């Protein structure tokens, strides 16, 4: 929740002036490289070493950002006495001469961010003191200390907005902002502030917005800026936030205490208008139930506040936590990334106007739903990434979530939800129960069922539009579990076997589905079962991580724009993929990590022409002669390694065997002729019989 730099505001003001020509409109002109239109001179980034002197003298806005001016001399701006806005952002300024602004009586907004004004700060301060009508001043990024800042702001009582962000302020006292009784907005983020003396802001009676983010404040005690409406103290090292205990009305509406080291829920004003409270990423918890209330002396903390010669002692009951804080106007509460193990009784009852509650990434194990807890105005509830094993619904309670629209229960330990939890939840549109080991009820659960929750029933939830059941270990769907809903987004990913190889359990919601994720659900290659023709409004389909060997079927008029077929068993790209009319509207398709055969990707060129984006084109590979080749590197036409496959197989083997047989025959003949005579002699000698005569 940082403030936009003032130079951005000026830039926006400049951009709304259109560069056009026509009746009654000044024509954009170039003056030494600067663009000039309607009294605005834009000289950004022109490598100027000095302020140009040839611009129209009636210019009201001069933008000199990103020019190496280094110095602003007494005569630099004399030619432009009507300036109202001047931006010198990143101009390497280290000196502003004493009378540089002497002729600038109309100047209202001045941006000096990201320069080196600390080097000659006394002379620069003297120049600023002549701007008696200045309202906005940006001194961020100038390496200013608190003494330098005090001198520069001295006597500038007309200021309404000041930025001292990204400087080297460390300790604040009442002398820095003395005399700024009209100041409305103060930006002190990204300094090194570790201490703020009591009364440092007391003179700023009109202050409404204060940004102290990204500093080193260890605590805020006795906070008493009743006129403040916005306070950002995020990204400090706060361990305590204690508002003054006086029963006085506070105007504070937005309080950002996120990304600190708070141990306890902040002690807020007893009477206030707070509607947004940001507490994420702290170390908070509720501790009342963990301590023995019979020992009151062990339940208080005393803060010793030393202000000059005055010492004050503030005593705080540690375990009263939220009881004395006024939360009646609170609408947005973010308590994520803390150490909350439970919500104490009555906590949510103190927030009747609460519409958004974020409790993700805590240690909640159980949540009790009672009357007015959560409040009836709640529209968004995030309980994800906790340790929830049980949700308790008070007996006879109905309509507790009647205005709830978004309910996130993902990444918990739930087995089911209480019967009747979603009764009369007529506004709910989004439910995320992914990564819980739940099961879907095979049939409607009786209203009077009093047993422990063992399943979840989504039937007849007419308002439900988005349902995520990713990684829930669901068994095969039976009996149309989504009947009576009008789902547009459904995620059943990482539930192996949930569809039992067929998409027929989804036909009840096929006409309304727009986004369907069936990643890693065990879909096979049955062509009849993979027909998505009935899903007429489907825009995005994720079928990655399955075992598909052929493209799914799409017929009729289909609105499909994104198709993900990664990590399947596809070996070829059938020609019908390109020729089918429903697929020609695809804008993005994912096809990588499939065992394609390089001899079966003849339609790849046509595929690239018809589909606007093959998102993973560079990662699509195929198998060619036991080698993995990227499809984009294949030569045009049929690859050489595929030509042999076009020849008759019998002829191929004949050609392969015939040379071997001929070689063997010739070898045998040569051997026989070579050893013919010795061989005959051996035969005769061994086969000789003696004569009987």
From Swiss-Prot:
Gene3D superfamilies hit by this protein: Ribonuclease Inhibitor (3.80.10.10)
PROSITE patterns: LRR
Signal peptide positions on this chain: 1-19
Lineage: Eukaryota, Metazoa, Chordata, Craniata, Vertebrata
Organism: Mus musculus
Family in the record: Belongs to the LRRC32/LRRC33 family.
GO molecular function: receptor ligand inhibitor activity; transforming growth factor beta binding
Protein name per Swiss-Prot or TrEMBL: Transforming growth factor beta activator LRRC33
Classification via SUPFAM superfamilies: L domain-like (SSF52058)
A Gene Ontology BP annotation from the UniProt entry: immune response
Ranges where the LRRNT domain occurs: 29-56
Gene Ontology terms: cellular component: cell surface; endoplasmic reticulum; endoplasmic reticulum membrane; extracellular region; plasma membrane
